[in-house]
């Protein structure tokens, strides 16, 4: 998905399309494994040095609450 497609998806789900949420969603969309929050953080921090683990956890929670992703138990 493109940046604008992801932004539209987030907005249509009632979320603000922040760069953090877009990056996390894009990562999950392109990596069809079941990564941990730490794996997502490790992959994105080089590209987005201002990201923190808290940012990743909050983005994941927002995406789950909007039913855009599902947790794996």
Identify the role of each PLM range.
Residues 71:
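Short beta-strand "wing" residues that participate in macromolecule-binding interfaces
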Residues 22-27:
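Pre-recognition alpha-helix immediately N-terminal to the DNA-recognition helix
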Residues 60-61:
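Short, hydrophobic-biased segments on the C-terminal half of alpha helices
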């Amino acid at each position: 998905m493109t940046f604008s497609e992801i932004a539209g998806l987030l907005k249509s789900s009632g979320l603000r399309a922040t760069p953090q949420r877009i990056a996390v969603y894009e990562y999950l969309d392109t990596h069809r494994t079941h990564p941990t929050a730490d794996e997502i953080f490790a992959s994105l921090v080089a590209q987005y040095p201002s990201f923190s683990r808290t940012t990743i956890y909050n983005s994941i929670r927002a995406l789950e609450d909007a039913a855009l992703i599902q947790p794996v138990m």
